[in-house]
């Protein structure tokens, strides 16, 4: 991985030694080489708050030599990210999130859903049109604020992420049971309503998180809980 032995190439994939959970897959998408020699929170480019991102351009020069920053799994220029969960005998789920995977959250969207949550709908904002009702812009607000004091704020964000994702992984079981044995039309209706409701709940939760972080970290001060 360090490029010291170019003959010993890394495999394209590896077989896990034990069964992995959906949550482990989610979290693998958030990696910045933490705990390895390439840990991007530890080198000089991370600054005073352990920021694992390097702004463009990616290359830089020192003493006449050109260097290049690594590109981690999680990256700031993310429009959306997802993990597909194929489930035997059950409707698949697209776990869908907006913006940087390391500081955003996945919500369940059933694959037989027939409508899109308004907060995620095409046309609700764009790269040149900010709108308060857009999940893309809300998640960007929180994430870009966190980049200023990443070591502290990312921990606050991660608490909300883990709580939501673990809750949803359990919550979908009740919806699965509710859809079992119903007609295709009835299943689609339940799946669509559920997917939209949860996306809206997440949007509301992230709006509260946005305000919480501003209150806690305003003007460079750290308020007690």
Labelled PLM ranges:
Residues 1-225:
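C-terminus-biased signal that marks the final domain/tail of proteins
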């Amino acid at each position: 991985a360090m490029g010291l032995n170019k003959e010993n190439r890394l495999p394209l994939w590896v077989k896990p030694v034990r069964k992995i959970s959906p949550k482990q897959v989610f979290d693998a998408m958030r990696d910045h080489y933490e705990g390895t020699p390439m840990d991007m929170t530890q080198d000089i480019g991370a600054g005073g708050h352990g920021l694992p991102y390097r702004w463009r351009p990616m290359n830089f020069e020192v003493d006449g030599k050109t260097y290049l920053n690594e590109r981690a799994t999680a990256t700031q220029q993310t429009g959306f990210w997802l993990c597909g969960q194929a489930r035997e005998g059950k409707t698949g789920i697209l776990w869908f999130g907006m913006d940087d995977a390391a500081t955003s959250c996945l919500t369940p969207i059933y694959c037989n859903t027939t409508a899109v949550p308004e907060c995620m709908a095409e046309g609700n904002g764009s790269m040149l049109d900010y709108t308060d009702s857009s999940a893309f812009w809300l998640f960007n607000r929180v994430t870009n604020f966190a980049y200023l004091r990443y070591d502290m704020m990312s921990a606050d964000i991660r608490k909300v992420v883990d709580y939501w994702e673990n809750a949803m992984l359990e919550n979908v079981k009740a919806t699965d049971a509710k859809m079992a044995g119903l007609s295709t039309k009835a299943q689609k209706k339940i799946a669509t309503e559920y997917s939209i409701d949860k996306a809206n709940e997440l949007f509301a939760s992230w709006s509260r998180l946005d305000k919480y972080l501003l209150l806690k970290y305003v003007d460079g001060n750290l308020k007690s809980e």
